[in-house]
Amino acid sequence: MKRVLFLTNYASPYRVHFYDELAKSMDVTVLFTDRVEDQKNRSADWFVSGGGAYRPVQLKRCVAHLLDENLCLDVTGWLKKPYDAIVICGYSSPTAILAMRWLRRRKIPFYMEVDGGLIRQERKIKYLFKRSLVRKADQWLSSGRYTTEFLVHYGAEKSRIHVYPFSSVFEKDILP
């Protein structure tokens, strides 16, 4: 069975369902950098627990609220384990940046998954920084056309972007 590792911020409901579905066909481990109880923008009722199909791992905070983000140094211990694929969700958190740099230094390929993004006018230094982060991935997972445009804008190679149908709608939710 294929083994896949995801690194993301917190267990949002649509992601939990996605990981549960994916875990029906492969061994899925998901590393979370943020705790649900620390989310101030969301009601606790918004979060759901998974169906138990994937393995959730709460990383330990080393530096809390670094630029309102967590830095979890224990991520590297998980990256040392053998996986068929490693997926970094997003590109800008301190833990994601640490993970990408660690993987690149060891020439371990990884995917970057992005679920949306807006192309804005920004200072050149900010654009170049974002571009340097996005370009670190070997391949990209995009949730749709606008995300693909965002990734290409920041240096992703279009031929290595994989668009996947991402939805939180289940067959049972569709009206007859």
Indicate where each model-derived feature is located.
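N-terminal subdomain of nucleotide-sugar transferases
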Residues: 1-58, 79
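Short N-terminal targeting/anchoring amphipathic segment
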Residues: 5, 75-94, 109
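Short, well-ordered alpha-helical microsegments
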Residues: 13-16, 94-97, 148-149
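A short, charged, and often flexible helix/loop element on the N-terminal side
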Residues: 50-73, 88-89
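A short, histidine- and acid-enriched strand-loop-helix "catalytic/donor-clamping" loop
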Residues: 94, 108-126, 136-139, 143, ...
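A short helix->loop->beta-strand "cap" motif at the edges of active sites that frequently abuts
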Residues: 106-109, 158-159
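Donor nucleotide-sugar binding/catalytic pocket of nucleotide-sugar-dependent glycosyltransferases
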Residues: 135-176
